[in-house]
Design a protein with these regions (language model features):
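N-terminal cationic and glycine-rich segments that engage phosphates or anionic surfaces
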Residues: 1-122, 127-137, 199, 230-233, ...
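Positively charged, low-complexity, intrinsically disordered RNA-binding extensions
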Residues: 137-256
Length: 256
């Protein structure tokens, strides 16, 4: 089954994508710093800084992000986390997490992207209340000793884990996320990324080229938007159809 990073990965090499990575990490750090600006006593801030450094964000950008929350940077506006929910073609449910310092810029952009590709922007809770679960997801480097890992993970409140290439993805209930992550850290497992995420309860199969193409373009536009941090969806598209979509996009300019 196709997964969202297929689209996001196409933009990694561009200068524009690098600028967005810096921008999003800066906002994540600013949000995390609201609780406390010292990463030694603010685990969320420490995680945000670690993630930013892993993606190549420079120290001066990180320092400015912390100063932004503290009010030292007087030219900066407050960063907000806003979720937008709706549907893509084919009845595919979509949740977009945006980090913005200007609602008047972000909201019209989200409405445009949904409508331009045959989707509909809904009200808060219109899909998150029934189409998704909300819980923890922790990615670690696949350990050499899987037997030991299984023994450790069974002693935690983790829900499940799956192998994805050289990574292990552990899922948890929202209330158990912190304790499971702490147990993995104490056991010296290398955490690649972690956070609270939406997970589809059921997937919506898309078998036709036209809706699959519009979903592709919609997600591509979300990826390009400077305020969009994460997109979750319920699309179930075969690898064969997804490859056909990618080939079509590569050969022709899509028009909405």
């Amino acid at each position: 089954m196709w997964r969202w990073p297929t689209v996001a990965g196409q933009k990694e090499a561009s200068a524009k994508a690098k600028s967005k990575i810096y921008n999003i990490h800066s906002k994540l750090i600013t949000l995390a710093a609201e609780k406390w600006s010292d990463p030694s006593i603010n685990a969320a801030l420490a995680d945000a800084i670690h993630s930013a450094k892993r993606d190549g964000v420079t120290s001066d950008v990180i320092e400015r992000a912390v100063k932004r929350w503290a009010g030292i940077d007087k030219d900066s506006s407050k960063v907000e986390e806003i979720f937008y929910e709706g549907y893509a073609p084919g009845g595919v449910a979509i949740i977009v997490r945006a980090l913005t310092d200007n609602r008047n810029r972000t909201a019209p952009s989200m409405r445009h992207i949904f409508s331009a590709f045959g989707g509909n922007l809904g009200e808060t809770g219109s899909v998150s209340n029934f189409a998704f679960d909300y819980g923890g997801e922790i990615h670690i480097k696949k350990p050499a000793d899987m037997d030991m890992f299984e023994m450790i993970i069974l002693d935690t409140n983790a829900e499940n884990y799956i192998e994805e290439g050289e990574e292990i993805v552990i899922t948890t209930a929202r209330e158990n996320y912190a304790s499971v992550k702490s147990a993995l850290e104490k056991s010296d497992y290398e955490i690649i990324s972690s956070g609270l995420w939406y997970r589809a309860k059921n997937y919506t199969e898309v078998t036709e080229m036209e809706p699959a193409l519009k979903i592709y373009k919609m997600l591509e536009e979300f990826a390009a938007d400077e305020d969009v941090e994460t997109v979750w969806n319920t699309a179930d598209i075969s690898d064969t159809l997804w490859k056909e979509v990618e080939q079509f996009v590569a050969s022709k300019k899509f028009r909405t």
